[in-house]
């Protein structure tokens, strides 16, 4: 039986009194139908004696004086009444199959006087499963009905004192006056009994016996009208309390769910769950077709109508259910159709055992492995409510079935194993088959890979691996074929509110079949191996070659230097011509891409400094002619394959004469640095020495950059790198200054910088004439020995690794290897120009002697600068900060002998 309430939706909300009176009429009708399901006899109403009203009031007062403990004992004693026994061993009350005339139902709903007085001695015509019996006479202290419906709060005063002839009074005119008098009398009674009723109501609510009292009201004998409508508390306007009272009277008490969180109430795992630990009383099943009206349908009127929406579930649900998830067994005795047998412990409310901490240990509320099969630590008493409506939580109709076939949520098989039935279970099935509902067909396949274990397994197989990170219950695992569960399954926990997602181990990492056939524009190349097929970054962005003269993009090596086309043409015209260029400034004009045409004199000087000579062009032409002559001669004296081979060898030998090492040295060679000296001022000791110190610091910055760009230098230890630069900076500057003096002024003067050139006068003025003479002699050695630019570059790099501490460096072994490599490079450069080994050794001896001659000059300059630093405040010579630090810290180590140069020859 179902009661659908639609208050506040179609019609406006009635007044509170009328609202409460309407519910009282409704519940009185329900109560009378439950107690006396037979036809109504209006004659009993009129046959009531005139003094029945006073007798009922006396019974009501006596009933209120009884303690709640006596009422509870009386209620427990009612279970042995014939009315309670009439429910049968399984506790089913098939109210939806009562055969009642429509006229009697309409009379019970339409006439309010039928709800005032119960009819004793009425036989009931029961349906299936109910016996025709005579209800027991009412006890004097029977409070089943008032205690059950007392939660409704205050009763409607207009009906609380109605007499037996209320039907005649209401049909006459002017009946409202009588109702007002009755209302006043009722209010006086309420004031006297208010305190007792409030205490009784609190005890009833605290004991949580609302659902039990509603059941006893359905099976207890009828009581008097005043006992049913007797004392109550004040009228409450709160709709929440009214809804709570309605739910309690209908057996859907909300008090049992108030302690749950909103998420647990929405999840619904406390609904339709078999009571843990309850006695597994089972009755023989009726065929499924006979149970449609009472078990699987929504109400008594829907038992004969099988809609298309629920037809798949009703037709195949019993076949998909096996075992104790429902306490139902499949039997072929009842005509071969699927049958259900229901235990009496199937509860509508959440079991009290679920509140125990031990009951939640095996429950995962994120993956929903609703392990409800095991017995609880403390089995609760059997729950009285056994007649519930069975629903399939995954049966959402044909529309959902069509959409579910397209889902790809992965293999959700075998996530729950329901427990076996109790020891007294009469179910022939000892195991259950409970798994997640599949959302795809076997033909379509699945997007995710295997989840670590198949759905197969027998009952009691505890070795199955759960795909979602938790272990299955060891009992109740039914064998399944393949990885797909049966299409229809039963969830003991009720409606599942969210779909469990597979763990990361379940996600398929390989490409699917639809991707394997597509190789893409780059063939069968995988992303993880794509780096093996990518060319170096230099292939896409080659290092840009710049002109050594103006800094523009170089077009190649012209006249012995890497220059652009403009500087190539300029040098050819200027070197072959007879014009003399003079600088309008101080011979320190800036030559770049935009100002290279401003000063031809400085541009030509820079070309010579870069090593450009007309002889390099002539040597190149002679080399090409020689190769051509050798090729023509080989064509006459040898087969056709030999000329190509000889030409290739000749080209390789030519490339060896210009190794890559030299190209690097040419590219990293520092440019010309100006001292910033004012040549318009008269020369003085302080001015000249201050300009030299300023030039030394500027050149030191370029030396650091140049050293870091040398091949292999960065492989040294950081401390070794700093030490080598700080010890060799003076020798490097002297050697570079001698080369500039040789190339620019033919060693007649000391070419420190374009704006600082020392002649004889300045040499004397600087008070370092002896040191200047030795430096000029070094510059003349470049001319006497005819040092080439390639030899100069290699010798300069080797000079960097020619002075070390006596105690050695931190990585002395690697320093020695690096120094030896540069010596070999110098010997290779010498060998490229000379074919005679004797001349090569002589040349090597000359160059190494020249390198050894730099060290004594550098030592004299170290001593001079250190003495000058000490007397700088007296002679007004400025020392930049970095120069002062190096001279004050590192130079004393050299002068004291802690740091010594490495000589090629014995001194």
Swiss-Prot record:
Polar residues composition bias: residue spans: 123-134
Post-translational modification: Phosphorylated in prostate cancer cells in response to several growth factors including EGF. Phosphorylation is induced by c-Src kinase (CSK). Tyr-522 is one of the major phosphorylation sites and an increase in phosphorylation and Src kinase activity is associated with prostate cancer progression. Phosphorylation by TNK2 enhances the DNA-binding and transcriptional activity. Phosphorylation at Ser-67 by CDK9 regulates AR promoter selectivity and cell growth. Sumoylated on Lys-389 (major) and Lys-508. Ubiquitinated. Deubiquitinated by USP26. 'Lys-6' and 'Lys-27'-linked polyubiquitination by RNF6 modulates AR transcriptional activity and specificity.
SUPFAM superfamilies per UniProt: Glucocorticoid receptor-like (DNA-binding domain), Nuclear receptor ligand-binding domain
Biased segments, Low complexity type: 55-76, 200-224
Superkingdom assignment: Eukaryota
BP GO terms, sorted: androgen receptor signaling pathway; intracellular receptor signaling pathway; male gonad development; negative regulation of extrinsic apoptotic signaling pathway; nuclear receptor-mediated steroid hormone signaling pathway; positive regulation of cell population proliferation; positive regulation of gene expression; positive regulation of transcription by RNA polymerase II
The keyword Phosphoprotein belongs to this UniProt entry's keyword annotation: yes
Cited InterPro entries: Andrgn_rcpt (IPR001103), NHR-like_dom_sf (IPR035500), Nucl_hrmn_rcpt_lig-bd (IPR000536), Nuclear_hormone_rcpt_NR3 (IPR050200), Znf_hrmn_rcpt (IPR001628), Znf_NHR/GATA (IPR013088)
Positions with a binding annotation for 17beta-hydroxy-5alpha-androstan-3-one: 693, 740, 865
Gene Ontology molecular function, alphabetical: androgen binding; beta-catenin binding; DNA-binding transcription factor activity; estrogen response element binding; nuclear receptor activity; steroid binding; transcription cis-regulatory region binding; zinc ion binding
Site (Interaction with coactivator FXXLF and FXXFY motifs): residue numbering on this chain: 885
Span of zinc fingers (NR C4-type): 547-567, 583-607
Chain intervals for the UniProt region annotation (Disordered): 36-152, 200-231
Main location: nucleus
Modified residue annotations for Phosphoserine: 67, 81, 261, 638
Cross-link (Glycyl lysine isopeptide (Lys-Gly) (interchain with G-Cter in ubiquitin)): 833, 835
Keyword terms of this UniProt record: Cytoplasm, DNA-binding, Isopeptide bond, Lipid-binding, Lipoprotein, Metal-binding, Nucleus, Palmitate, Phosphoprotein, Receptor, Steroid-binding, Transcription, Transcription regulation, Ubl conjugation, Zinc, Zinc-finger
UniProt-annotated stretches for the region Interaction with HIPK3: 559-649
Spans annotated as Interaction with KAT7: 612-906
Residue list for modification Phosphotyrosine: 228, 272, 310, 349, 360, 365-366, 396, 522, 539, 903
Domain NR LBD, first and last residues per copy: 656-887
SMART domains per UniProt: HOLI, ZnF_C4
Annotated domain remarks: Composed of three domains: a modulating N-terminal domain, a DNA-binding domain and a C-terminal ligand-binding domain. In the presence of bound steroid the ligand-binding domain interacts with the N-terminal modulating domain, and thereby activates AR transcription factor activity. Agonist binding is required for dimerization and binding to target DNA. The transcription factor activity of the complex formed by ligand-activated AR and DNA is modulated by interactions with coactivator and corepressor proteins.
Purpose of the protein: Steroid hormone receptors are ligand-activated transcription factors that regulate eukaryotic gene expression and affect cellular proliferation and differentiation in target tissues. Transcription factor activity is modulated by bound coactivator and corepressor proteins like ZBTB7A that recruits NCOR1 and NCOR2 to the androgen response elements/ARE on target genes, negatively regulating androgen receptor signaling and androgen-induced cell proliferation. Transcription activation is also down-regulated by NR0B2. Activated, but not phosphorylated, by HIPK3 and ZIPK/DAPK3.
Remarks, miscellaneous: In the absence of ligand, steroid hormone receptors are thought to be weakly associated with nuclear components; hormone binding greatly increases receptor affinity. The hormone-receptor complex appears to recognize discrete DNA sequences upstream of transcriptional start sites. Transcriptional activity is enhanced by binding to RANBP9.
Protein name: Androgen receptor
